[in-house]
Amino acid sequence: MVMYPENFGIIGENPELKAMRYSFITVGIWWMSFSQYTFYFLPDQNERKKIIKDVVWNGFKELVEVWNELKKIIIIKKYLIAFFIYSSALQTVLLIAAYFGEQEINWPKDEKTIGLIVSILLIQLIAMFGAIMTSKLSEKFGNIHTLILLNIIWALLCIGGYFITEPIEFYIAAAFVGLIMGGIQALSRSTFSKMIPETDNTTSYFSFYDVSQKVSVVFGMTLFAFVDQITGSMRTSILVFVFIFLIGALLLKRIKIKNY
């Protein structure tokens, strides 16, 4: 719709902008329509629980309690530190990829928008195959070894990103990103699930995992912006994450491989 608005009867001034607005509506209709299946078949929670005023504060207290428990389990503590480090680079690269492509790639006239859309679609499509490939690698070599390998590949991608200037190079990089993006995210989560103790309160543990991931984004984006501000170069900022991924790989190497 955005790439070829005239095929959808969208004409006039700035048809691409109009098409983008319409696309938001169609996506909303898509989610509303297909979510009905879930709403219909999921069991209905009839029990109504009273909303407590201190629910947010209690959530923070629960996270602190989980952290105190996790600190006693050395292997999880080591893993979460490694995860925080490489996740800060991973999430930041994913967030700024489109902006990097817009600012740093020499797109032909009137092809920038289409090129960025194609790149995003390419990443999403290939991510499925990447997740399958990562699953096979983890079965053969173990989760930790596979995560170390993926961190090294990410570091190499960041080095390659420093030299990318042409659209074809950006497409190739996007394909590699898709290949390892879904895999490292899924494998990181499954590795954490293997490490947590047997408990009925797994939700709290994964809540802490998710909070760690969100905080890592803040750290990564702050680091990226700081380097970009000092050097005036987005490419130099990308190079910083080479070291972040390598540090993540080294921290993962400290974890005993048994059962992981």
What spans do the regions from the language model cover?
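A membrane-interface helix-boundary motif in multi-pass transporters
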Residues: 3-28, 226-245
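Multi-pass alpha-helical transporter architecture, strongest
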Residues: 30-41, 184, 236-260
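Juxtamembrane intracellular "pre-TM" segments in multi-pass secondary transporters
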Residues: 43-80
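Intracellular juxtamembrane helix-capping segments at the cytosolic ends
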Residues: 183-197
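Helix-to-loop junctions at the C-terminal end of transmembrane segments
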Residues: 129-143, 228
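Short amphipathic helix-loop junctions that connect adjacent transmembrane helices
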Residues: 95-114
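Structural signature of the two symmetry-related core transmembrane helices
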Residues: 145-160
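Helix-loop junctions at membrane interfaces in 12-TM secondary transporters
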Residues: 162-174
